[in-house]
Regions:
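The N-cap/first-turn positions of alpha helices
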Residues: 2-8, 29, 61, 68
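Core residues of bacterial helix-turn-helix
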Residues: 24-25, 43, 64
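A short LG(V/I)-centered, amphipathic sequence patch enriched
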Residues: 40-57
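Interdomain hinge and pocket-entrance segments immediately C-terminal to HTH DNA-binding domains
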Residues: 84-91
């Protein structure tokens, strides 16, 4: 599991559209699709239901989202702590 995949997953969960998610992560739609498919393969479950012009989180996607968000937040806090010598705020 890669940080980029988690970030793309979280953005797609917000946008519910592959094209808009690709724009937000500064890549092409096919890369977003590939990252999500790889993440789904690693987790062994589908995270999104793909519809004609949008996607919806599956039950598994809803369960996974808070963990992905927490992982990204923890990584960013760790990055700041190392880069700037500060401790993360909060519990």
């Amino acid at each position: 599991m890669e940080v980029r995949q988690l970030h793309t997953f979280c953005v797609l969960a917000e946008e519910l559209n592959f094209t808009r998610a690709a724009e937000r992560v500064h890549t092409v739609q096919s890369n977003v699709t590939s990252q999500i498919k790889s993440l789904e393969a690693e987790l062994g479950t589908q995270l999104f239901d793909r519809l004609a012009k949008r996607v919806l989180l599956t039950e598994a996607g809803h369960r996974f989202l808070p963990y992905a968000e927490k992982a990204l937040t923890a990584m960013e806090q760790g990055h700041r702590a190392v880069k700037f010598g500060s401790e993360p705020a909060g519990p």
